[in-house]
Amino acid sequence: MAISTFSIGDLGYLRNFLQNECNWFRICKKTFYREYRSVATSSPIFSLKNKPKKYCMHCEMVVLKRSHEFMFSLAVNGIHFGQFLTGIMKFKKKQVAEGLCYYVLELGSISPVDLSFIPKYNSDCVTSMHCVTPELIYENCSIVCPEEASRLTVKGLGDNKLIPLGGCGVWCLKNGGDLYIYAFVLAYDLYVACYDKTIFPSLAKIVFDMIACDSEDCVFCKDHNKHVSQAGHIVGCVSNQETCFCYTPCQKKMTDINNPELISLLCDQEINKIDIMYPEKKASLSLDINSYVHGYLGDEPCALKCVNWMPIRISSALSRLIILSCPVCKRVVMD
């Protein structure tokens, strides 16, 4: 079997994709080999040459060890892609909760190699990991205190610059190789008492559900079907799993409220318009939701209830799972 031709650029893009865009789940561990699987969203830097673009990248990797080197065979979307050699290969375990863990891959430089055979990939094997649920997110987050918030930059230059993820009141912090989601979410007691347990009640989600348009052709309000399974259960694209943060309505300024049932979570008054706000000058993270969204009754502004909301930081292990399962959030963070 001849070694496929890969340019230096091709190998660099592949290495970047495998390390930074894939969450790996271990499928098989044997004495002489291990097998891992990743279900990733489409990549802005890596694709299969001469193949139609796929919104889901199902990657299967069989790893062999020889002396002080590692060899791995890679298949993408059911097609054997190539075999590669590297001197450094580490799978760093990320434990989200009992029953939900995955691995982040660290690779040295890679080069093509010919193993003279193609291993059998366990394409039909399904991971047994637990799903990401709203309850799991609450269990894996911390409340942001004023001291921490003062060190986070929402607008302007700063060491801890938050990246807006698109929705109202949600950001990502890149800290070395770790990702952290910061968001405003409904207080836990209110979630337990009066909210749908299958949906994570972020401020971004609540505001989105209040003002999203009804057009089936709107790519902002309706086009949410290019996610992938956060725990690798399903090969192929899935709809937003209601635990993402990519809720960006097409209209943000002085928009009519279409779903008044949620108003009481934001305000005691019967507001009829929402205005999503963005800081215009250098600012650290405010813990007041009125800094990011205003309610209006006609033209009169109404104060929103901060007591119903809490600012949180989601653990890095869970944040990475959520962000990399969403094509929108992933691209925003990678840019």
UniProtKB/Swiss-Prot annotation:
One Pfam short name: Herpes_UL16
Keyword Nucleotide-binding attached: no
Gene Ontology CC annotations of this record: host cell cytoplasm; host cell nucleus; viral tegument
Subunit structure: Interacts with cytoplasmic envelopment protein 3 and with the capsid.
Protein name (database record): Cytoplasmic envelopment protein 2
Disulfide bridge map: none
Function summary: Plays a critical role in cytoplasmic virus egress. Participates in the final step of tegumentation and envelope acquisition within the host cytoplasm by directly interacting with the capsid. Upon virion binding to target cell, a signaling cascade is triggered to disrupt the interaction with the capsid, thereby preparing capsid uncoating.
Organism, scientific name: Human herpesvirus 6B (strain Z29) (HHV-6 variant B)
Stored InterPro entries: Herpes_UL16/UL94
Cellular compartments annotated: Virion tegument; Host cytoplasm; Host nucleus
UniProt similarity note: Belongs to the herpesviridae cytoplasmic envelopment protein 2 family.
Chief location of this protein within or outside the cell: virion
Keyword annotations: Host cytoplasm, Host nucleus, Late protein, Virion, Virion tegument
